[in-house]
Amino acid sequence: MDAHLDELGQLADTAGAGVVGRTYQRIEAPTPNLYLGQGKVEELKGLLLKAGSTLVLFDEPLSPVQGTNLERALAVRVMDRTEVILDIFATRARSAEAKMQVELAQLEYLLPRLTRMWTHLSRIRGGIGLRGPGETQLETDRRAIRRKISVLKKRLEDVADHRANQRRGRRDLPSAALIGYTNAGKSSMLKALSGDDLFVEDRLFATLDTLTREVDVGGGYRVRLTDTVGFIRKLPHHLVASFRATLEEARAAELLLHVIDASHPAWEHQVEVVENVLEEMGLYEPGGGKRDAGSGKRDARSGKRDAGCERPERKRVIYVFNKADLLPDPDAFLEHVREHYPHAVLTSTHPASRIPHPGMGVEGLRSVLRASAQALRPVARIQVPVADGKLIAALHRDSEVMSEVQVDGVVEVTARVEARLLGKLRQQGITVEISV
């Protein structure tokens, strides 16, 4: 419970609200009218009066009725966790795409709460006895919001199509995505691996837009690495749905780097939160069995799949335990972690940190990425008839061509080729030799 309230306090701080007190109540089930019991509401009124507070944040989602009744009973502004997160996203959105995604989520959250929001407007206008809008005005606003939601969904579908076309046009390099709980250090990891001067901030949801960089992983290999928006406990469904075009980068990636804040006391729960969201996206099947010893992937042999969700392609997942410089005993931590994640990488992006383990740290992660790139894009010599210009052009488009030599009516192309493409070439009768 304390950890949950700590995180809610962090969200409040990120949103610009100062926390002056906290309380909780254990209940078997929330009451339909106030969520809390009447006695707790009276206690909360006393705490608010004593502290002079004008805002109450709830860690749990409130129904429109509960929110309205609580505000009447407490005579202060009431926000649930979802509304706080939406507010943070609204202030952090920078790109046109992120702003559309946030606006869509906000409107879908607002629609069933429109009457309550009008009550706030009446208060702001300040007149005693000032009546709220009539039913005609409310219905007009509802129709306008529904139209706007429809427009935003169409625009975001266009964005998703555009992203998909972009990905199809850049399959020459292996693709990887940084995923993880918010503030785990994903952006810092991209900055450290790429060497670029990227914006990094030690705050929740510092990054909302995807950012992609080509990373040199050594041995002549490069990986196209994408930073994605962070996840959080009880991430609003509206946001998951609205940010689907952005999160699709993780779905489309051939490799996932799950960045974990090793110093956080609840890191295991944070891992579970991230994997649950990935299940919603179809990257994992529900069932939560063992992690695969070779890659940290879930055993997806049990559990139902979400309706309408395509069977996900199993991906290699590298578990990256970051912020190792904040651990009191990195050796003991690594020993514990490797019982469940045998190939885990322990890192720190802090410039002054030293990871006292061979193969660890950012450079250790780079070598792990190199091995993955070699598996995803093996070097192959492919013999293509000179007349098959279409296939030669496709190899240049979808592979990293290293050399091309024409001998006796055959073009021998040496390239780093997507592993699954090699099988298709062999099925077409094309001679393929893998370089070891």
List each model region and its residues.
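Conserved Switch II/interswitch segment of TRAFAC-class P-loop GTPases
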Residues: 27-35, 57-64, 233-236, 251-273, ...
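Conserved G1/Walker A P-loop phosphate-binding module
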Residues: 117-255
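Conserved nucleotide-binding/hydrolysis micro-motifs of P-loop NTPases
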Residues: 27-29, 61-64, 83-86, 229-232, ...
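Flexible beta-alpha connector loops of hexameric P-loop NTPases
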Residues: 30-34, 92-97, 136-137, 197-199, ...
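Canonical P-loop GTPase G-domain recognition
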Residues: 73-126, 130-133, 284-285, 311-385, ...
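N-terminal accessory targeting/assembly segments
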Residues: 1-81, 85, 436
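Long, well-ordered amphipathic alpha-helical subdomains in the mid-to-C-terminal portions
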Residues: 371-421
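Intrinsically disordered, low-complexity proline-rich regions
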Residues: 288, 293-295, 300-302, 307-309, ...
